[in-house]
Amino acid sequence: MGRKNIIFQNFGLVWCAVLVCLAVGSSYGQPQQAFIHVTDQMKHEPVAFANVCFEGIKHGSPKYGLTTIEGMIPNDVKDISKITVSYMGYTTYHDTIHPGQSLEILLQPAVFNMKEIVVTGQYSPETIDRSIYPINVISNRMIDMKAATNMAELLKEQSGLQVSQNGVLGTSLTIQGLSGQNVKFLQDGIPLIGRMNGNFDLNQINLHNVDHIEIIEGPMSVIYGSNAIAGVVNIITRENRSSVLSVSANAYYESVGVFDTYVSVSANKNKHGFYLGGGRDFFQGYSYLDTSRIESFKPRRQYFFDGHYSYTGEVMKLKFSGDYFNELLLDKGALQPVYYETAFDSYFTTVRYTGRVDAAFNLPRNQYINLVAAYSSYNRRKLTYFKDLTTLQQNLVETGSVNDTTGIQSIIARGTFANNNAEKKFNYQAGFDVNDETGTGKRILGERQEIGDYAGFISVKWDPVRSLSFQPGVRVIYNTKYRAPLVYALSAKWSIVDNLNLRLSYSRGFRTPDVKELYLSFVDIIHNVHGNPDLKAEKSHNINLNLTWNNDHGRSSWEMHTNGFYNYIENVIILAQVKGLEYQYVNLVKYKTTGFQLGTSWSFYPSLKIQAGMAETGIAAAANETEPTGAFVFATDFTLSGSYHFIKPDLTFALFYKYTGKSPQFQLNEDNISSGYIDPYNTLDITLSKGFWKQKIRLSTGVKNLFDTRTIPATGVSSGAHTSSSNSTNIDWGRTFFLRLSLTFNKYK
């Protein structure tokens, strides 16, 4: 298929959605009566859900209403009336208004730095400064400014986080020097399944329907169980809480051959809410060498759909939701001798879907019940074809183990009961967690294996004085394959003075091997990888210290933080080269990481924000009990980002820079640990976005990887069982240009 046809195919979907959006906009965009428009005096942006009171001067009782998300409310008074407009964080406005009069009201901000609300690890939704855990929040505004289309693009320039690239297995995340197999990925509190080589492919997490992302670094095993030794990444999806009907469409193009489209519609009526969205992401592949048939970045096509229905009552909220993901990845093989007219091509199809039901109860006396049940399915199928490049005919290879389907099914049930009253000295949370995972496929020993993990947990929050909080917690686990230890943690928060907070925690962590690490058997012409039923479970100790200071003065806000950590993990599981080209999952007896992070941000309301960060992470390891871990080997990274919003033209300029220092790498080869490193490199992204038609349309453009960083020399460590040998590592596909178009239209009562 030609490049021009690909463009028409991808953008044709969006133009259909654009016509629907324009129809909605033309029907509801132009008011036919007098309206009051409430805007922020500094930002010149609408103030949504402001409280408006109309009261007749001569007679009549007060009438109350709320502005729409566009900051509008109809003026339907019959006589001259007093109008009062109020909203949290703004000075109350008073005036008089006549029948049929349209009025623009400028509210004066009284608070310039509103605190974010977080839910990860909390008894109930809390402001971020009240959380006993240090939480990093990546807002929807930041996602839009970076023009990130998936989780890999979003996290690669975060301080202290490292994103690694593999052509077939995708991208993986490292936190505090610990690999992605120790990072728990959640979507609205439910674990995502479908890891490859222990890591979750970040390219498979799209951001089209994401409200914000909450990241906690450090063990959260008491609350979230296995795979949470390094931390938790919780993806919070959007919900339409205001408009009767909302239609949106997005299209994204990147010059390397990326074409992404997404369309969604949501509605609210009385207490009922509906949402349905779907899209297609396409990447045509990229190779550093035009003469090579083997592509450095594999072509892929993704389809995804998600939807939900919710009922919100005075006490209870009930939500049914589901999502579907389908990816096709093509791994082109090398030309075969002797005529070099044929090749073996492999197609990897990944299908993942989840269905879930959530029930939340807000009870009297600040008590909360949350229940969730979910079923998730993951299937990855590999089909290999022998292709004749002269006739373009291909035939399925039916011999050996070159074809396979591996499946994982997961059943999850979770419930919590919490008491969280800020006026009380004692609060608590108790809950249960049920996880049952089944793996199937020819590469699984016996073609079917099942692991069950059943746990109960409790934590207590004690505030002896208003400035001091302690939160001990414990988790009791029964695992069908392993004798699990008692997992416990103690966290503390001390407000030393106003705006200066110290957080300290000690945590135990626990991770059981997954089905693939235990029972995988994968042998073909280029792979010889085996699971290990004798693996021991990982156990960890973690100490975290965080100091945060912030100061709000008028329109300016300044924040500084520092974070130190130490991790000691027994029996960390890695893929090791045990003999020749044979690889097996084994336990690395001792593994330690330590380091610190420094960060600062300064903003001047409403236009300017600057952030800078620095992280130092050290790693040490030993293969057996008698071998010392040796000295820590450290890596450094530095980040700098800034944005400026020009109010009148609604134009935003942003840049994102990261320096990644010399990074140590460890590999186990036949009971010996070999070390190496990846050379330092720099990346820089620049974006420019502008809103049109009262923010119904937004156009973004920019340059990604301005320094054209591609491959970086790697010394001392081979590429491993899933990639070809090389003395370099792929970082990015180079400098690219992008264009993004977003349309959103809303109808209100």
Regions found by a protein language model. Give the residues of each.
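Short acidic/polar hinge/loop motifs at secondary-structure boundaries
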Residues: 74-76, 163, 190-217, 532
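N-terminal periplasmic accessory domains that precede
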Residues: 101-106, 151-154, 171-174, 186, ...
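Extracytoplasmic beta-strand/coil segments of soluble accessory domains associated
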Residues: 135, 152-194
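Flexible loop and strand-edge segments within Gram-negative outer membrane beta-barrel domains
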Residues: 283-304, 315-369, 375-409
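Outer-membrane beta-barrel signature, preferentially recognizing the C-terminal barrel domain
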Residues: 342-362, 495, 501, 508-568, ...
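Gram-negative outer-membrane beta-barrel transporters
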Residues: 465, 560, 564-568, 587-668, ...
